[in-house]
Amino acid sequence: MSNTTNQSWGGRFSEPTDAFVARFTASVDFDRRLYHHDIRGSIAHATMLERVGVLTADERDAILQGLGEIEQEIDAGTFEWSVDLEDVHMNLEARLTEKIGITGKKLHTGRSRNDQIATDIRLYLRDAIDVVDAELARLREGLIELAAREADTIMPGFTHLQTAQPVTFGHHLLAWQEMLARDHERLRDCRKRVNVMPLGAAALAGTTYPIDRHITAELLGFERPAENSLDAVSDRDFAIEFGAFASVLLMHMSRMSEELVLWTSAQFDFIDLPDRFCTGSSIMPQKKNPDVPELVRGKTGRVYGHLMGLLTLMKSQPLAYNKDNQEDKEPLFDTLDTVQGCLKAFADMVPAIEAKADNMFEAARKGFSTATDLADYLVRAGVAFRDAHEIVGQAVALGLREKKDLSEMTLDELRQFSDAIGEDVFEVLTLEGSVAARNHIGGTAPDQVRAAAQRARDALATLRQEA
């Protein structure tokens, strides 16, 4: 029976694929972005096949030359993609056969599209992770340097978005940096599990050809071949893991975004973003909108959605490969694009943030931010903490009635609540004294912030060297 489908798999079919079904099942519109990695995998596969004697040297050379020419065509925008050929693999193989004849049909020996696509995605994701890694390092560096610059800048620290205790702006920035440092570790761990090669697993059970998977793994830079052929072609947990990393990263970046949006508002007025990172209003001439952090905050939700989509995609699939897995690429690609874009935007923007130190300081003076310092003072004077808590609460109540901060009260006003209060109390009620007193590792004292920034610099430098 002749092939009536014009497909590589059409031998057992008696009629062509329905035109709508062909379009519905095709993936070339989105998986074509894998062409470079598909060609890399094919070059390694052909090289291995020649070394084990499945291909001749002339056949290998013809395949490698043909693949190189095809890559140039795609790069130049002259390659014609066909939906009828389903996917990136068959488009490239069909063009290779056009160029070099029957030898092109030998390339797929000992290989299935199942292990081919799993390999392509891992190659693509590995390269993309390296881009994300570099941008994340750049963002962290920007935060570290800004924190060192603002080590002495005092601002209110918040709980429940209510003034809690004074901190330094540098300390706050380093909190963000610590979150991103853990994200960086998660990314590096994810890359280790991405860097395992499925190629050679074939459809699901391996192949009868005398392949050497260690050769292809070495040529493609993989740490090792996958141990189990069924697992190699059927699971996408590595993509899910990247989606989980991306979700945690953007959760952190969304929290940063929320604060940046608040801080640029007239109600806070803590920072200024350069005009190049903001936009205006079509109707309100005065507006300067913090679009970059707002968009990062908004894009976080779509990355969460992609993670849930990938988890749901995989949850009920029997081994091994199923067509469901075609749906893994669009959410993964969009997650990658989104993460790379968000990181680049923030890495460019963060070093240009301008702190409005006077506004931050004045805000920290409101809300009785040194109340805990007064309680600690009383404890050091021998008052039990719970009693000290009650005493300071009464002092705060007076301040609310009189519209005075604790530091603005007279000694007599303070001593009406406790005889343990002396002249030296005012040293702990200043904002400068409050932050300076927290002079330990992890504390907000300016010297500790500078030391923490240096440790963060050193850790980031080590991480970059390990890449």
Swiss-Prot record:
Its main location: cytoplasm. Signal peptide: none annotated. It comes from the Bacteria. The keyword Ribosomal protein does not apply. One of its GO terms (molecular function) is argininosuccinate lyase activity. It is an enzyme of class 4 (lyase). SUPFAM superfamilies: L-aspartase-like (SSF48557). The keyword DNA-binding does not apply. It holds the Pfam family Lyase_1. It catalyses: 2-(N(omega)-L-arginino)succinate = fumarate + L-arginine. Pathway: Amino-acid biosynthesis; L-arginine biosynthesis; L-arginine from L-ornithine and carbamoyl phosphate: step 3/3. One of its GO terms (cellular component) is cytosol. One of its GO terms (biological process) is L-arginine biosynthetic process. It is found in: Cytoplasm. Keywords: Amino-acid biosynthesis, Arginine biosynthesis, Cytoplasm, Lyase. CDD domains: Argininosuccinate_lyase (cd01359). Its EC number is 4.3.2.1. Belongs to the lyase 1 family. Argininosuccinate lyase subfamily. NCBIfam families: argH. This is Argininosuccinate lyase.
